[in-house]
């Protein structure tokens, strides 16, 4: 009898336990609403590796010779520039670029003189046709701003050194004999010559600013360079000064 009572008690306790489990509510899981949020942007850590980029460059250039207290007028020289550059990649989208560029430009202007033969006030002139060769060594700091996919906007600033190789003046004389003789006595050249040999300093230091757009391996850029030093080698009077500024637009390809 006691065994039967014990069995009945165990069955009752088991039934109560099962009933309690059925009554217990399961814990609800809260879904992450941001999982399907289209406005949520995944934070991608920008990885950067140091390196060197190599480019070739070709473009149009315009030089502006700006004389002060000299009988020459302002002269614009137009031409082409070719060369190669390499850029050291730095953190935070910065870069440092240098290289070697060759420039060939041509320009002309008229230098007027009072006639020594005419009975009245009359001017004669020398037409200067100048062909200039130089090398340029730029040192530029670049900053790049990503725009869309492989399209970037960039800006640069920095100095550059123009090394004058030659500036040949193929002049044409429109002078009377008396005016020509007088100019020769004053030391004014009346035959073709290299202005770099005696008149001008070969080193032209400039400060440049510019920028452009870059798509993958291709770059289109433009900039302006301000001449900082006097190019007159032997000033004949106080305040005699000439500087050379420049503007360019070029196309670059990265290997």
What are these regions (language model features)?
Residues 60-77, 105-135, 164-208, 230-246:
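Extracellular/periplasm-exposed beta-strand and loop segments of Gram-negative cell-envelope proteins
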Residues 128-134, 141-144, 149-150:
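Helix-adjacent hinge/juxtasegments
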Residues 21-86:
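Short glycine/proline- and aromatic-enriched beta-strand/turn motifs that initiate or cap beta-hairpins
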Residues 38-40, 56-58, 80-90, 100-102, ...:
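Residues on the lipid-exposed face of transmembrane beta-strands in outer-membrane beta-barrel proteins
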Residues 217-222, 228-233:
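Substrate-binding/catalytic groove segments of enzymes
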Residues 23, 148-162:
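Exposed, low-structure sequence patches enriched in small/polar residues
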Residues 1-26, 251-255:
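Bacterial Sec-dependent N-terminal signal peptides
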Residues 45, 89-93, 146-150, 216-218:
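Outer-membrane beta-barrel channels and translocator barrels
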């Amino acid at each position: 009898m006691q065994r039967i009572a014990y069995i009945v008690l165990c069955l009752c306790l088991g039934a109560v336990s099962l009933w309690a489990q059925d009554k217990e509510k399961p814990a609800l899981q809260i879904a992450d609403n941001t999982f399907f949020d289209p406005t949520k942007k995944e934070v991608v850590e920008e990885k950067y590796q140091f390196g060197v980029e190599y480019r070739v460059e070709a473009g149009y250039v315009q030089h502006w010779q700006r004389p002060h207290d000299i009988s020459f007028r302002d002269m614009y020289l137009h031409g082409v520039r070719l060369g190669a550059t390499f850029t050291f990649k730095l953190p935070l989208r910065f870069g440092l670029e240098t290289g070697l560029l060759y420039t060939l430009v041509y320009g002309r202007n008229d230098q007027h003189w009072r006639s020594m033969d005419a009975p009245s006030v009359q001017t004669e002139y020398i037409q200067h046709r100048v062909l200039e060769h130089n090398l340029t060594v730029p040192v530029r700091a670049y900053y790049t701003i990503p725009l869309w996919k492989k399209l970037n906007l960039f800006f640069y600033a920095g100095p550059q050194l123009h090394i004058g190789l030659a500036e040949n003046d193929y002049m044409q004389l429109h002078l009377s004999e008396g005016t020509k003789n007088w100019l020769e006595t004053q030391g004014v050249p009346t035959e073709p010559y290299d202005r770099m040999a005696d008149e001008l300093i070969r080193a032209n230091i400039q400060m440049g600013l510019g920028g452009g757009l870059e798509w993958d391996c291709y770059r289109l850029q433009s900039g302006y360079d301000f001449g900082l030093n006097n190019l007159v080698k032997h000033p004949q009077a106080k305040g005699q000064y000439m500087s050379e500024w420049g503007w360019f637009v070029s196309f670059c390809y990265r290997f």
